[in-house]
């Protein structure tokens, strides 16, 4: 499991870096009420994050042993961990959506939504699934590994729906004329 979480962290760091790099651009243009640039920045961020996460997902599906061998030289462990890595990171291809939306929430001054989707993924979904799935399937260990991609898929769906609603709301807010008295 440590190998799999290490590979997951390895995958997450560049995604977070890309998304954090877009934050000041999005925030600046949101503050300047430049909706076109906010949309364009988000679109580019989403495409970049999604392309990266799909490419990494494909690499893990094609050659999981390559990633496992970064963290262990034990061939028996690598032989067991490689197919499990495919299962554990099954939702990685969609993870670019999660990160792009989460970081854009923060850029638009909506850190609460960002926190909600982060908590949703790990605590509301993953922890209960880790306990529930082993009771529902015969191979209990497989149930634990399957919890991660299932939680990821549900969380990405929830995030995309919430983001779509909040992003439209933020864009409408930018179109409203500002009241100079409110700035005093």
Region spans (language model):
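Small-residue-rich hydrophobic transmembrane alpha-helices
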Residues: 1-58, 62-64, 95-114
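Short runs within selected transmembrane alpha-helices of multi-pass transporters and secretion channels
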Residues: 15-20, 88-107, 113-122, 144-160
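Short alpha-helical transmembrane segments in multi-pass integral membrane proteins
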Residues: 26-91, 134-184
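Transmembrane alpha-helical segments of integral membrane proteins
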Residues: 125-134
């Amino acid at each position: 499991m440590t190998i799999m979480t290490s590979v997951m962290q390895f995958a997450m760091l560049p995604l977070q870096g890309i998304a954090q790099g877009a934050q000041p651009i999005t925030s600046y243009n949101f503050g300047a009420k430049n909706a076109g640039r906010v949309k364009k920045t988000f679109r580019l961020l989403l495409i970049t994050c999604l392309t990266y996460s799909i490419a990494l997902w494909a690499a893990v599906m094609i050659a999981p042993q390559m990633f496992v061998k970064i963290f262990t030289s034990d061939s028996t462990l690598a032989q067991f961990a490689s197919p499990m890595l495919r299962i554990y990171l099954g939702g990685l291809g969609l993870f670019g959506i999660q990160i792009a939306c989460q970081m854009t929430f923060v850029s638009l001054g909506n850190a609460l939504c960002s926190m909600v989707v982060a908590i949703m993924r790990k605590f509301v979904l993953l922890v209960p699934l880790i306990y529930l799935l082993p009771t529902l399937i015969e191979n209990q260990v497989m149930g634990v590994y399957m919890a991660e991609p299932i939680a990821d898929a549900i969380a990405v769906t929830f995030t995309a729906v919430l983001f779509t609603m909040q992003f439209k709301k933020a864009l409408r807010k930018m179109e409203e004329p500002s009241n100079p008295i409110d700035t005093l």
